[in-house]
Amino acid sequence: AHKKPPSELSKDLYSFINKLAKKFKKPATKLTIDSAEGALDNQFYNDYGVHLHKVAKLKKVDMIDRVQNIVAQGRFYYLDTEANKIFIEEHRNYRWDEKTLNSDDPKVIKEEDHTCDQFQYFVRDNERLLGLRY
């Protein structure tokens, strides 16, 4: 698979943010990104003068726990749109690798999980806003 360079990703991200802001008549308030994606942050800042908000990863089990907390409380809603079908499908199929379940650091199966990872970063970056206490 072709991985886009930061110069292309920056333009795509900017276009996506503007498209959603226009559609929902709401500006983006916090642009969360994996702290390991420094090159994209640098490119986005160079192109648009805006830094993305970098979030440090926790252990996968702790990232997932935060998402499960929000969902279990019935505090997560999504728009039932064509574009969101991939989000639901990926979360339905998200699962632990059985070979690692009894280890100190269980792993998930890393297939078709982009929206799962993104949602974990969103929740992690907005713990205070979401009223989570860890």
Please tell me what each predicted stretch does:
Residues A1-V108, L129:
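Mg2+-dependent endonuclease catalytic cores in nucleic-acid-processing enzymes, primarily RNase H-like
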Residues R124-Y134:
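Acidic two-metal-ion nuclease catalytic site recognized across multiple nuclease folds
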